[in-house]
Amino acid sequence: MSGLLCYCRQGFEPELAAELSARAAFVGIAGYARTQRNDGYVLFVCDEAAQLAAKLQWRELIFARQKLVVIAELKGIDPKDRITPILAALEGQQRFGDLWVEHPDSDAGKPLASLARSFGNALRPALRKAGLLTDKPQPRQPRLHICFLDGDHALLAVADSADSAPWPLGIPRLKLLPEAPSRSALKLDEALLTLLTPEEREALVKPGMRAADLGAAPGGWTWVLTRQHVHVTSVDNGPLRAHVLETGLVEHLRADGFHWKPAQPVDWMVCDMVEQPRRVAERMATWVREGWCRNTIFNLKLPMKKRWDETRLCLELFEQQAEKSLIVRAKQLYHDREEITVLAMRG
C-alpha cells in the first residue's frame, strides 16, 4: 500500500478527493482517491506517495487537516495482539521521532478514541525496544502515525514534522475564553496559527500595526487582533461588545463593511461577512489591487453543492483581480463550517 492519507471535516471527503486528484494530476503523478462520504479522511492511492507529498505542501492543501505518507495498511488485526503485526510492518523502517495513535474525526471514528489512547501507551515501549522510536520526542525526525479505522483495521503512516499539522488529528485545541465576543474568534485564532508559519506570524503581526475588520459585530475578530496589540478600525452597522471598545485600540465605524474603504492603507484587512463567495472574492481583490491593505484574511461561505468548483473559481477570481504578486493560502479550518478561510500576503 502506497499513498497519501489526509484527514478532513466529516462530509467534505468529495471536496478533498477532488482537490488531491486535481493537484496530483497537475504535478504529473497518477493515482486515485479512495473514500466514502462521512469517513473523515481520504486515502489517495499512488505509487509515488513520497514524491507527491513533497510537491503538495500541507499549508497549501485547502480541505486537508493533515497530510501523511502511508507505509502499510493492516486488516484483520487480532485485538489480542495488535503490536506484533505493526512491528512486522515497520521492519526496516528508520527510527521515528514520535508516535501519534489516532482515529478519523467522524461519527464512526470517535468511538475509537479510547483504543487509540490506551494502545499508544502499549505500543511506545515496544517500538523503543525494537529501535523504532526515540526515547524522547525528536521533532526533526519523521513522526509515526497509527490511524485506526476500526478495531482490526489500521493505516500506518509517516509525517514530516516540518510539513504537517503539529496537532493530533490535525486539530488545534483552542480554548474559547470567557471574554471572547463570539465563537468566531476561534476562526481567526486558528487562521493565524495554521495559515502563517511561526516566522511569518512574528514578522507580520506586530504590536502597533493597523487593521480593518469588515463586518465586525459583535467583535470576535477585532478582539483577537487587539490581543496582539493591533489598532483596529471595526466597520459594521451593528454594535460591538463594550469590553472590546474599552481596550482603547478600537475605532468603531457604523457603516457597510462591504463598501467602506480606508483613508490610509492598513497592515491587515480581515473579513468574515455572510455574503456570496464570488462577491467577497471580488471585493477582497479590490482592497489588494488598490493598495488599501498589505495583507488580508477573509472567509468564503461555500454553497451546498460543487464546493470544490466554487473554491477554485473564487480563488482564481481573487488572484486575477488582485493584480499583485501574492502568497495565497486557503484552509477549511476546524472552527470553520461550510466555508474556507483565505490568507493573502505580499510576496
From Swiss-Prot:
Positions annotated to bind S-adenosyl-L-methionine: S184, A217, P218, G219, G220, D236, D256, D272
GO BP, sorted A to Z: methylation; rRNA processing
EC numbers on record: 2.1.1.186
Catalytic activity reported: cytidine(2498) in 23S rRNA + S-adenosyl-L-methionine = 2'-O-methylcytidine(2498) in 23S rRNA + S-adenosyl-L-homocysteine + H(+)
One of the record's GO cellular component terms: cytoplasm
Active site: residue positions: K301 (proton acceptor)
Highest taxon in the source lineage: Bacteria
Keyword hit for rRNA processing: yes
InterPro entries linked to this entry: RlmM_FDX, RlmM_THUMP-like, RNA_MeTrfase_FtsJ_dom, rRNA_MeTrfase_M, SAM-dependent_MTases_sf
Alphabetical list of SUPFAM superfamilies matching this protein: S-adenosyl-L-methionine-dependent methyltransferases
Pfam families, per database record: FtsJ, RlmM_FDX, RLMM_N
HAMAP family: 23SrRNA_methyltr_M (MF_01551)
Family as reported in the entry's similarity comment: Belongs to the class I-like SAM-binding methyltransferase superfamily. RNA methyltransferase RlmE family. RlmM subfamily.
Entry-linked NCBIfam families: PRK11760.1
Assembly notes: Monomer.
Designated name of the protein: Ribosomal RNA large subunit methyltransferase M
Lineage of the species this protein comes from: Bacteria, Pseudomonadati, Pseudomonadota, Gammaproteobacteria, Lysobacterales
